[in-house]
Design a protein with these regions (language model features):
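N-terminal secretory signal peptides that target proteins for export/translocation
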Residues: 1-2
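Bacterial N-terminal signal peptides
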Residues: 5-17
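Scaffold/interface architecture of coatomer-like assemblies
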Residues: 19-304
Length: 304
């Protein structure tokens, strides 16, 4: 074979190989899914110092690769403080105001924002989102309890809507006995809105009396399940323990972990809809010692 023929043959081979290697690849942009995770011991104290290797993350029971990891995450906080002004919580209201003011002063960093919502027969936004703890304190000071009913679920709907455009961690801190006496928004609707808007609910359950008689146990149960189903937490409180409860919420928010992942490729029939999220400890011993909390999932079209 002549040098020219050999050269042409080699060139054709290289060209064919290059074409095979350069076959078009189609990429689909998959949004990063952020999951904020709280880890506590059996006494409820936050656990810090864990690493990415300490966690396993699953979407719809399928293991995912953790692409982003932060401990004591600096992700901004957007917090709504929702206070019940109805007659059922009248006796503890002054202590609730003061404890909420201390909380805002304690927890807000330069990158954080807070808002105040008040509810009784109706619901209303009080301050608008602000990074100034003094403005939050002023808004809280201007609230006065009444004698009307409680639009509890409507307040969750309003708060979720206010938090929807905010970036970072969306947190709703509710102070109430959970006694919903105003028709309009149902429990299911309120929970669905909070999950869709990725709102973590921290429920502070006002205990009017120690005995079960005279208490709205169904309302208390609703406040507990709303917290559990959104990755938050529920606390019982009276006048003496309000400051301590707010302090525990602040500690919980300060020590959260951020786990981010790009969901693995899904079959066409799996596109869209609700995607469950589970976070576990990699070590079986840690799984037995610690409790892990995170939002239960997200709607695929709204991943953030």
């Amino acid at each position: 074979m002549s040098r020219l023929a050999a050269g042409l043959a080699l060139g054709a081979l290289l060209s064919t190989t290059a074409m095979a290697q350069q076959e078009p690849t189609f990429h689909v942009d998959v949004p990063l899914v952020n999951v904020f995770v709280s880890v506590t011991d059996k006494a409820g104290a936050p656990i810090g110092g864990l690493t990415k290797d300490d966690f396993q993350l699953f979407e719809n029971d399928k293991a995912q690769t953790i692409a982003v990891f932060e401990r004591d995450t600096s992700a901004p906080l957007a917090i709504v403080l929702a206070l019940d002004l109805s007659g059922s919580v009248y006796k503890d209201f002054a202590a609730e105001q003061q404890a909420a003011q201390h909380f805002a002063k304690d927890v807000l960093r330069p990158q954080d924002r807070a808002d105040v919502v008040a509810f009784a027969d109706g619901t209303r936004e009080v301050t608008g989102f602000t990074g100034e703890a003094k403005r939050i304190a002023s808004g809280l000071s201007g609230l006065h309890p009444g004698t009307g009913g409680t639009a509890f679920y409507s307040s969750i709907s309003l708060s979720s809507g206010l938090l929807r455009p905010e970036h970072g961690r969306r947190v709703l801190v509710m102070i109430s006995d959970g006694d919903n006496t105003v028709n309009g928004v149902s429990y299911e609707d309120a929970l669905d809105e909070a999950v869709r808007d990725e709102v973590m609910i921290y429920s502070i359950i006002d205990v009017p009396v120690a005995a079960s008689a005279g208490r709205d146990l169904a309302g208390e149960h609703a406040m507990i399940t709303l917290a559990e189903q959104t990755g938050g937490r529920a606390y019982y409180a009276d006048q003496a323990s309000l400051d301590q409860v707010f302090h525990r919420i602040a500690d919980d928010l300060r020590t959260q972990y951020l786990l981010g992942y790009y969901p693995r490729k899904r079959a066409p029939e799996e596109q869209g809809g609700f995607r469950s999220i589970a976070v576990k400890m990699s070590n079986a011993q840690n799984n037995a010692k610690y409790s892990v909390r995170n939002r239960p999932g997200y709607y695929a079209s709204a991943a953030r």
